[in-house]
């Protein structure tokens, strides 16, 4: 794909002549200290015309083209994975009763076959962008479907998906096809031609904003004090740091303070020549770590691809010049670029300078307005107050990455029949494909409205919907995020007004976090604790599972009344007091103090503890028999302990079956841990191959349906079954964790077993 032609190749001496000529056309070199430091003089900013001339200064297109190629390539990989092409039929299957969460309620997904067409157009656009083929059209073909899919589902929003759309939008207006592109092969005027400086300025400014605003957001007290990503330091990637530091100090100094300093300084380190090598090292190390720490798709690689934009624009030519001469025929041009109408050239000897035209002024205006808008949006939450909850603004465009971590203890959805008054409960997340609605008032309103349309099909008329959702943010108390007394179907919500039924985050209780950690660390390994904060006038109805044989409630602050429903008894607790709770029964905790109450459940899962003791006994017995210290024969039902599996004979007890399953699980974990790198890498490639294979086959099926019509259901079922096959993987590799790496909503595990309610 190299944009090379025989006439375009030159000798080293002619390269030097062309380079000198290009420099002469571009104007005098910056010899002042400011010019060397910033790349321009203060006088270049003294008037609009000078600024336009600066932003349209002819610049080497090589680095921009490399970024275009890499970004397009990464989007080609992203579409089947994080955009969800491989699992599109599961998300948009026709006829599903599913509650969706678009930005605008008028946005609706197309029928499934047409959604595959949308994704096909997006994929072809990304491919054309990468190759520089029909470049401007390819950018539009990628951009429009991308933003349609993005706006169609708020539950998939995040900072990096938003960034991809911004970068594609910027590239649409740039001349990134002036180097290393098919368009350059077909059009001599575009081949190896200058691009205006603003092409680089916009991209560099965008990446600078991503880093710097992310750093400013990390000045939040929760991040500085080390509560945002408290458990991240347990990852093996931080093992080298833990040779010198404790896990707590690694979390505080490396994860939190190190992340803060890196984000604040990365843009500056990359901008200045003297510090760029340091910046490239640290941001590369940072993004390589992130690619292993988080499931963030192509984000780490896009940021790695953007880093060379801060280097000298001609760095690809210098790289090509070091390659063997024969290989250079297959690589991009290393000759100096030719003039372009997109740029403004300063006067050379004996010639007057070029006056900026309308296109040059539009390019400069676009640069300034776009960067100002990007600086404003992360702080525009005062306009979109309806999207403010415990954290401000829409999710994705604020660059507050990893600042807030949440844990959900309890979610209860209650419906009331508007005519009969009958009460009922819904499984949390019913009719949805996501868990994200639990934290956002706008999604909760959409969910309630959707449920009010679906429940009449199940003989619930005029349904009223109530949500009781308990969340802990950054290791605080579990507390309600929404008022459970409000019917969300009828509740008012506006994107521009504060949502009245969002409960405030109890910031006054934040200092309790240190005390809560002390309490946790003082408990033994078999004792669990849940910390609760509740508002005056509200109560918590809870059930203690029969497995939790030793459960107590202790008041930390305020005053509560505990009602034992079955015994019809009430007991008031004041600060420091506690009481035992009977297992297998309901109880209610009423907050009677004028200020929020704080209390904790302390419990031991006695059933689990007994099981662990029994399994430990079986393990000890197995080891004794194997080393010869146990001479007596094992009963027939315990023989599988030695054989590792059931081979006929009496049916082993449930305890023995549990022991065998655990042993098999531990052996599989050990086997995977000791698997050589090349086998792990091969398994990784097979999983990715399945994703792309299924994406391709399902797309072909849908496009065939659009062109030729749908075949019989039996044939469709056979085709989908074939698309679901994993012909490249061994049977042993087929486990639920391998089903589809692109699935954006894995099942949610219960974080604490204090039962279905808590």
UniProtKB/Swiss-Prot annotation:
**What topology in the membrane does the UniProt record assign?**
Multi-pass membrane protein
Q: How does it assemble?
A: Monomer. May interact with CALU.
Family of this protein: Belongs to the vitamin K-dependent gamma-carboxylase family.
Gene Ontology annotations for the cellular component aspect, listed alphabetically? endoplasmic reticulum lumen; endoplasmic reticulum membrane; membrane
- Which molecular function term from Gene Ontology is one that the record holds? vitamin binding
- Spell out where the chain crosses the membrane: 61-81, 114-134, 137-157, 293-313, 362-382
* Disulfide-linked positions: 99-450
Looking at the record, which disorder is this protein connected with?
Combined deficiency of vitamin K-dependent clotting factors 1: VKCFD leads to a bleeding tendency that is usually reversed by oral administration of vitamin K. Pseudoxanthoma elasticum-like disorder with multiple coagulation factor deficiency: Characterized by hyperlaxity of the skin involving the entire body. Important phenotypic differences with classical PXE include much more severe skin laxity with spreading toward the trunk and limbs with thick, leathery skin folds rather than confinement to flexural areas, and no decrease in visual acuity. Moreover, detailed electron microscopic analyses revealed that alterations of elastic fibers as well as their mineralization are slightly different from those in classic PXE.
Activity-pH behavior: Optimum pH is 7.
The cross-references to Gene3D superfamilies, in alphabetical order and at most eight, read:
Jelly Rolls (2.60.120.10)
Supply the name of the protein: Vitamin K-dependent gamma-carboxylase
Question: Sorted alphabetically, which keywords does the UniProt record give?
Answer: Acetylation, Disease variant, Disulfide bond, Endoplasmic reticulum, Glycoprotein, Lyase, Membrane, Transmembrane, Transmembrane helix
Q: Which reaction does it catalyse?
A: 4-carboxy-L-glutamyl-[protein] + 2,3-epoxyphylloquinone + H2O + H(+) = phylloquinol + L-glutamyl-[protein] + CO2 + O2
User: Tell me, which GO biological process terms does this entry list?
Assistant: blood coagulation; negative regulation of bone development; negative regulation of neurotransmitter secretion; negative regulation of testosterone biosynthetic process; protein maturation; protein modification process; vitamin K metabolic process
Q: What does this protein do?
A: Mediates the vitamin K-dependent carboxylation of glutamate residues to calcium-binding gamma-carboxyglutamate (Gla) residues with the concomitant conversion of the reduced hydroquinone form of vitamin K to vitamin K epoxide. Catalyzes gamma-carboxylation of various proteins, such as blood coagulation factors (F2, F7, F9 and F10), osteocalcin (BGLAP) or matrix Gla protein (MGP).
Q: Give the superkingdom in one word.
A: Eukaryota
Instruction: Indicate whether Transmembrane helix appears among the record's keywords.
Output: yes
- Catalytic residues (UniProt): 218
Kindly list every residue the record annotates as glycosylated: 459, 550
| Root EC class | lyase
Which EC numbers does the record give?
Answer: 4.1.1.90
Task: List the Lumenal topological domains.
Answer: 82-113, 158-292, 383-758
- Any one Pfam family here would be HTTM
Modified residue annotations for N-acetylalanine: 2
Composition bias of kind Polar residues appears in 735-747
Q: Does the keyword Endoplasmic reticulum apply?
A: yes
């Amino acid at each position: 794909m190299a944009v090379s032609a025989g006439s375009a190749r030159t000798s080293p001496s002619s390269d030097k002549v062309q380079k000198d000529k290009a420099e002469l056309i571009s104007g005098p070199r910056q010899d002042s200290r400011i010019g060397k430091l910033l790349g321009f003089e203060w006088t270049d900013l003294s008037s609009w015309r000078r600024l336009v001339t600066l932003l349209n200064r002819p610049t080497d297109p090589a680095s921009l083209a490399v970024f275009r190629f890499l970004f397009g390539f990464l989007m080609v990989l992203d579409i089947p994975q994080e955009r969800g092409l491989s699992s599109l039929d599961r998300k948009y299957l026709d006829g599903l009763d599913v509650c969706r969460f678009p930005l605008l309620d008028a946005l609706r997904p197309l029928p499934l076959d047409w959604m595959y067409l949308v994704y096909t157009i997006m994929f072809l656009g990304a491919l054309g962008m990468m190759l520089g083929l029909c470049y401007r059209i390819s950018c539009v073909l990628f951009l429009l479907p991308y933003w349609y899919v993005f706006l169609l589902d708020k539950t998939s929003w995040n900072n990096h998906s938003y960034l991809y759309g911004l970068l594609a939008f910027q590239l649409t207006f740039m001349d990134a096809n002036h180097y290393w592109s098919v368009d350059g092969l077909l059009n001599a005027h575009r081949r190896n031609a200058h691009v205006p400086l603003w092409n680089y300025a916009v991209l560099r400014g965008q990446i600078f904003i991503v880093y710097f605003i992310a750093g400013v957001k990390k000045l939040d007290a929760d991040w500085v004090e080390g509560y945002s990503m408290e458990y991240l330091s347990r990852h093996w990637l931080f093992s080298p740091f833990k040779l010198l530091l404790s896990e707590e100090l690694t979390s505080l100094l490396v994860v939190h303070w190190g992340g803060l300093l890196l984000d604040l300084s990365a843009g500056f380190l990359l901008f200045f020549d003297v510090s760029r090598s340091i910046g490239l090292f640290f941001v590369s190390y940072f993004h390589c770590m992130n690619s292993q720490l988080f499931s963030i798709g192509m984000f780490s690689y896009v940021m790695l691809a953007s880093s060379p934009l801060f280097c000298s624009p001609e760095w690809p030519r210098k790289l090509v010049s070091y390659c063997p001469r024969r290989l250079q025929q297959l690589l991009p041009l290393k000759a100096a670029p030719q003039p372009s109408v997109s740029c403004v050239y300063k006067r050379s000897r004996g010639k007057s300078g070029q006056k900026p035209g309308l296109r040059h002024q539009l390019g400069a205006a676009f640069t300034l307005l776009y960067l100002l808008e990007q600086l404003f949006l992360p702080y525009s939450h005062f306009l979109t107050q309806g999207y403010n909850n415990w954290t401000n603004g829409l999710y994705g465009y604020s660059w507050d990455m990893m600042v807030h971590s949440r844990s959900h203890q309890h979610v209860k959805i209650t419906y009331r029949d508007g005519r009969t008054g009958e009460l009922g409960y819904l499984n949390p997340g019913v009719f949805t494909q996501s868990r994200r609605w639990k934290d956002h008032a706008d999604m909760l309103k959409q969910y309630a409205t959707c449920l009010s349309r679906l429940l009449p099909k199940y003989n619930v008329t005029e349904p009223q919907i109530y949500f009781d959702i308990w969340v802990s943010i950054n290791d605080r108390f579990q507390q309600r995020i929404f008022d459970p007394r409000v019917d969300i179907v009828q509740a008012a919500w506006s994107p521009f007004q504060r949502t009245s039924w969002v409960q405030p985050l109890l910031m006054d209780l934040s200092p309790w976090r240190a005390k809560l950690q002390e309490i946790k660390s003082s408990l033994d390994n078999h004792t669990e604790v849940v910390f609760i904060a509740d508002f005056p006038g509200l109560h918590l109805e809870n059930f203690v599972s029969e497995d939790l044989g030793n459960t107590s409630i202790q008041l930390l602050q305020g005053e509560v009344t505990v009602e034992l429903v079955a015994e019809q008894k009430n007991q008031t607790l004041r600060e420091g007091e506690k009481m035992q709770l009977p297992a297998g029964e309901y109880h209610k905790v009423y907050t009677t103090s004028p200020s929020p109450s704080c209390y904790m459940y302390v419990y031991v899962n006695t059933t689990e503890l007994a099981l662990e003791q029994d399994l430990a006994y079986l393990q000890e017995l197995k080891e004794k028999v194997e080393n010869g210290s146990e001479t007596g024969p094992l009963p027939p039902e315990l023989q599988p302990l030695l054989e590792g599996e059931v081979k006929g004979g009496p049916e082993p007890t449930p305890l023995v079956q549990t022991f065998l399953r655990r042993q098999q699980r531990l052996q599989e974990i050990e086997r995977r841990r000791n698997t050589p790198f090349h086998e792990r890498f091969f398994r990784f490639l097979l999983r990715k191959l399945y994703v792309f294979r299924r994406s391709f086959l399902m797309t072909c099926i849908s496009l065939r349906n659009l062109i030729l019509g749908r075949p019989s259901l039996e044939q469709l079922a056979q085709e989908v079954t074939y698309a679901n096959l994993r012909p490249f993987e061994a049977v042993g590799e087929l486990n639920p964790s391998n089903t589809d790496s692109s699935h954006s909503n894995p099942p949610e595990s219960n974080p604490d077993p204090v039962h279905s309610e808590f």
